[in-house]
Amino acid sequence: MNVTASLSRRPLGCLKAGLCQSLIRGYATAVAASTTQSTGALPDHNFFRIADKHTKKTRTAFAVFTPPKSPTTLPPSSVVTKSKAFKIANSKLPPLMTKPPSDPMPLLTQQQIARMDPTGARTALFSKARHAARVGDVLMVTHRRGGEPFAGVCLAIRRSGIDTAILLRNHLGKVGVEMWYKIYNKNVAGIEIIKRRAKRARRAKLMYMRQPKHDMGSVEQYVFAWKKMRKVLSSKGLTGGVGGGGGKQKGQESKKKN
């Protein structure tokens, strides 16, 4: 009696799980019935049809393009033949861009010198030619802003492009004075050669002339002689030379005496 009561009290959850598994297997193995519907029975959809207001005709919302009647052909001018391709290949191509210089400073220096010295007189005066100024010559620099010109012996010529400069030495009041002048400076009105050195110096810089043994002293006597000679030459040019102007003056004086 007690055994049957205990069996009747057991839960039935295991039976529910077994029944669910059998139902799932039946659904998986069952053959689905094919339901075919005739196309004629389907309703005609009018979703993409639009009625024209003027002609009252229906038109679809999609654009329909008809195929061209004849295949598209290119114009004869656009067709590239072998002869035309050969002519194009052998035609002169435009010149390529020149390669920029690796060092643009020399070109810039030349442009600056051409702007500061358009005639090229100062560049030729301090070039390495024979007729150019050398170290040891007596030079005179005239300022553009007025004042007394400075004359002295050229001790050195520093050639460095647009910054080319000369060093002049003179004595003012028994005191040695040296001045640097840039030849391309706008404030320098002119540079004159007062006296040339008799013999070419062996050195590029005559710094030994600062010593009392080799010091040239004041150059005022050379400047005075140069100005006197220049004045004589200018007076001869105004009077028409020695043979012309002098003869006329003598003739006028003889007439006055008579």
Curated annotation (Swiss-Prot):
Subcellular localization(s) per the UniProt record: Mitochondrion
**Gene3D superfamilies given in the database record:** 2.30.30.790
Instruction: Please name the InterPro entries in this protein's record.
Output: Ribosomal_bL19, Ribosomal_bL19_sf, Translation_prot_SH3-like_sf
The principal location of this protein is mitochondrion
Q: Which parts of the sequence are annotated with region: Disordered?
A: 235-258
Q: Name one Pfam family in it.
A: Ribosomal_L19
Gene Ontology BP, a term: translation
Could you tell me the superkingdom of the organism this chain comes from?
Eukaryota
Q: Name one GO cellular component term.
A: mitochondrial large ribosomal subunit
Q: Which UniProt keywords apply?
A: Mitochondrion, Ribonucleoprotein, Ribosomal protein
**MF GO annotations:** structural constituent of ribosome
Gly residues: which segments have biased composition?
238-249
Record-linked SUPFAM superfamilies: Translation proteins SH3-like domain (SSF50104)
Q: How does it assemble?
A: Component of the mitochondrial large ribosomal subunit (mt-LSU). Mature N.crassa 74S mitochondrial ribosomes consist of a small (37S) and a large (54S) subunit. The 37S small subunit contains a 16S ribosomal RNA (16S mt-rRNA) and 32 different proteins. The 54S large subunit contains a 23S rRNA (23S mt-rRNA) and 42 different proteins.
Q: What family, per the record?
A: Belongs to the bacterial ribosomal protein bL19 family.
Q: Function of this protein?
A: Component of the mitochondrial ribosome (mitoribosome), a dedicated translation machinery responsible for the synthesis of mitochondrial genome-encoded proteins, including at least some of the essential transmembrane subunits of the mitochondrial respiratory chain. The mitoribosomes are attached to the mitochondrial inner membrane and translation products are cotranslationally integrated into the membrane.
**Protein name as it appears in the record:** Large ribosomal subunit protein bL19m
